[in-house]
């Protein structure tokens, strides 16, 4: 599998160096937004706490198209913090993902032989709240990180839709932290910092103004590991709906659903509205893969960078 990784990397880098010349044509653009939410209460009979939240996101793209060559790049980033009552500041969003596809036209500019590279991680340490001391973090930048190289076919019937399918995909799970790797976090063997997987991969993305001042984006990633429990498919599905109120104000709602068979999550049961840990026979708390879900809504400043060409 290391030979496959090396071959795919050489093909990707060679193709990018060959075609990224001065006579190329690029289209670039994206969306930048900052959302702010604040609640202030004084002698409020209904109860509640003061809160402040700030979220920022960026969805950027750079696309090259000339002759039979197509090269698409997407960078998606998100980070958010919230302070509620007397609690310390906590993050409520943290995403970093880069996706690059280099393709050669196979049929009528709709099907492309494609090499894909994907990197996904986060910016800052994550904690199992309310414990936020620096020794209790459960994730950080590059712990985990997911890198993926794939050979396959990309279907691009329209500029706003693409669906890539690969039966030959190498994926690395990286846990670049001693304490987390010793604990065997995110599916690596205890003491190891890298887990290698080989399987099938699907990557689909749709982004379009579905009506005036309304932009809809959704992307779906599916991965099946041939080497271990291929029936347990990893899922990463994101949706972002943005509604432009005026030139600079935008309302947006985003969701993300993740299922990762390598990620062990603490298991709780609902006991009359109270979360109660589910314990093993030895008294330790049970862990296992679970469906993760995140939803963010906000109103704030947004700037849409319309695509422009560079020749």
Predicted regions and their residues:
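Membrane-embedded beta-strand positions of outer-membrane beta-barrel proteins
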Residues: 30-32, 73, 113-117, 151, ...
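Outer-membrane beta-barrel "beta-signal"
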Residues: 291-311
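Transmembrane beta-strands of outer-membrane beta-barrel pores
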Residues: 34-40, 66-68, 77-83, 117-125, ...
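Repeated loop/turn-to-beta-strand initiation elements of outer-membrane beta-barrel proteins
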Residues: 69-71, 110-113, 160-163, 213-216, ...
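Residues that define the transmembrane beta-barrel architecture of outer-membrane proteins
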Residues: 50-56, 92-96, 143-147, 194-200, ...
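Extracellular loop and loop/strand-boundary signature of outer-membrane beta-barrel proteins
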Residues: 43-48, 83-88, 132-139, 187-192, ...
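Outer-membrane beta-barrel translocator domains and adjoining extracellular loop/strand segments
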Residues: 41-46, 85-89, 126-132, 175-182, ...
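Residues on the lipid-exposed face of transmembrane beta-strands in outer-membrane beta-barrel proteins
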Residues: 30, 34-36, 56-64, 98-104, ...
